[in-house]
From Swiss-Prot:
Keyword Phosphoprotein: no
UniProt similarity note: Belongs to the cytochrome b5 family.
Biological role: Membrane bound hemoprotein which function as an electron carrier for several membrane bound oxygenases, including fatty acid desaturases.
Keywords: Electron transport, Endoplasmic reticulum, Heme, Iron, Membrane, Metal-binding, Transmembrane, Transmembrane helix, Transport
Cellular localization per UniProt: Endoplasmic reticulum membrane
Superkingdom of origin: Eukaryota
Transmembrane feature ranges: 109-129
Domain Cytochrome b5 heme-binding: 5-81
Lineage: Eukaryota, Viridiplantae, Streptophyta, Embryophyta, Tracheophyta
Record text on subunit structure and interactions: Interacts with CER1, BI-1, FAH1 and FAH2.
Name of protein: Cytochrome B5 isoform D
Taxonomic source organism: Arabidopsis thaliana (Mouse-ear cress)
SUPFAM superfamilies assigned: Cytochrome b5-like heme/steroid binding domain (SSF55856)
Length: 140
């Protein structure tokens, strides 16, 4: 089913999302895979869930063979208007990680210092009280 290079919007492609009329978008190209649904090894439901969106990631995640990729040419009907496909949000790491990490390290240091000093002070106080009470024996 060779296409003539027509350009479709994502809205137009989304209208073809049933088992009787199924179009998908992979790598910026539109494919009418209706006739292939029954032959798909993973079943038709796998393809039907990828309609109405850019299915490139779904297609690549499965790890299709080069034969499967070559089969797509049979079903090509045109290209997608990339302006109509939503841009995927990219992860942007926080910029002020050093300030947070430094603050965490300083508070960790204070906690560890207190965990060491408080028992030491309690022990010192206990020995001091014991020593004081022994040396100050009651005078009779």
């Amino acid at each position: 089913m060779g296409g003539d290079g027509k350009v479709f919007t994502l809205s137009e492609v989304s209208q073809h999302s049933s088992a009787k009329d199924c179009w998908i978008v992979i790598d910026g190209k539109v494919y009418d895979v209706t006739k292939f649904l029954d032959d798909h090894p993973g079943g038709d439901e796998v393809i039907l869930t990828s309609t109405g969106k850019d299915a490139t990631d779904d297609f690549e995640d499965v790890g299709h063979s080069s034969t499967a990729k070559a089969m797509l040419d049979e079903y090509y009907v045109g290209d997608i208007d990339t302006a109509t496909v939503p841009v995927k949000a990219k992860f942007v790491p926080p910029t002020s990680t050093k300030a947070v990490a430094t603050q965490d390290k300083s508070s960790d240091f204070v906690i560890k210092l207190l965990q060491f000093l408080v028992p030491l002070l309690i022990l010192g106080l206990a020995f001091g009280i014991r020593y004081y009470t022994k040396t100050k024996a009651p005078s009779s």
